[in-house]
């Protein structure tokens, strides 16, 4: 990998990062809930993550590992324990291809779950399809993660998140002219803003994109460039490291008094409200890819309990973790419906493609896999607004993205009888 790309990759890693913690709620519930350890023949499940390199991007797999430990302590998959093998791609496409090949061709995993990587989608999607193995990924970021037949991200992705933020601004502020600011990173860049732009074109809202160099962007110049376009709303589509100085520059120019500011999911970070300061109190709305980390739903509470009882104290309790938990639960519940003696890659892939109504209160809508050529089942999310040193949910709950790029996804949903 080109080392000169590492600073940008660090920023990409933060692009969807959030930080929050949760307390344990009761006893963790997993799988059969028998309280007896599984002792049969192991079922091999893998994951590819970017653990070492620019940043540690492995929280989804850590949560999945905790869930599978809980499953193994509660009867396993009808008596068979899960052997969960996590491989580090080191943020290197060549390494990603090598470690995935070992998992699929040497270790003979029947499925991968909890993947979180910025490089493996492009490196491995064809191999996964050729080998007939499914990936129920925790978090997808680059475009390639959402355009592969055998790769199924649990999260909604950056394009959907920005589109929902734009829809919120148009409805709440009656905005007719917006600017979307995003780092010019390959496979993310303009694509991350194009959903908002396409939705705007169909709904009488003009959306322009400003793509910035994440390594050399000047906050004041960028905000003045955005203001010069005379927008009603500015969509911030960047990691915290870029966001905070940009918001400070906007405050210095008094832009928050005449322009509305919204953001995609990266701003849903526990540190952001305090970092940007009181000027933005109740004046900065952000999209969430899942329901809030502090939500009181039983599955969200169980995610926290699983991490507390079967994970490490150092395991993040963030949205990456939520995604990994959901991925592991979906795979587990699919396997539990199968004859444990007949579990192999082909039968597992077939069973996963038949998933059409998986429910979790962490998600806004039932999740599905299906047989489509690509996957973006999670395309809804709520909005929150900065409130003091935290966030408050805004009325309206989950919003479904009206992105024209989802036309094929909507067709797949109709085939499955989903609305």
Residue ranges, per PLM feature:
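Beta-alpha junction/loop-to-helix N-cap segments that form part of ligand/metal-binding clefts
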Residues: 28-34, 56-62, 74-145, 154, ...
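Hydrophobic alpha-helical segments within soluble ligand-binding/sensing domains
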Residues: 31, 96, 154-178, 190, ...
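Periplasmic-binding protein-like
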Residues: 103-116, 136-138, 178-182, 230-240, ...
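Extracellular/periplasmic bilobed ligand-binding domains
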Residues: 128-131, 192-291
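Extracellular/periplasmic periplasmic-binding protein-like sensory domains
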Residues: 250-325, 397-399, 412-418
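Segments of small-molecule ligand-sensing domains
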Residues: 309-321, 332-395
